[in-house]
Amino acid sequence: MRKTFLFSLLILLLSGCKKDKFTTAPQLKYKSANTTTLGRFQTLSLTLSFTDAEGDIANTLTVLKIVKRCPNGSDGSFVQPYTVPSFPAAKNQQGDIIVSYSYNDVNPLCSPRNDTAIFKFVLKDKADHISDTAVSQPIIITN
């Protein structure tokens, strides 16, 4: 009897610890990249998924490209806004955002070496709630 009670209590506690899928602050997750090695004349497409309880996603997605320092002091890193398409407002909204860059947008500045970059993403909604930071896997940008 005691074991049954403890087992039931454990199941109840574990089921109560589930994180809500839809929250007031947008949730942003990195899903994938179309390539992990970007060469000349190619396009990099990074796919993110989002959820938002109020459905008030604004067009504010901030993208950070982070590259280790080059011997010449330049690193090719940047912080820039990325325009998110308009979504019709709906409760418990979810979807994907695809961020695309051509080779010339992110080309390596550490010549003659290849760059290895990671991309970080932050989404803000119309009520100024900010998502957690989503981080890509390392992307090699060839020279």
Describe the role of every protein-language-model region.
Residues 1-4:
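Positively charged n-region of N-terminal signal peptides that target proteins for export
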Residues 13-16:
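C-terminal motif of bacterial Sec signal peptides marking the signal peptidase cleavage site
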Residues 18-21:
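Bacterial signal peptide processing site
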Residues 25-143:
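First exposed extracellular module after export/assembly in secreted or surface-exposed proteins
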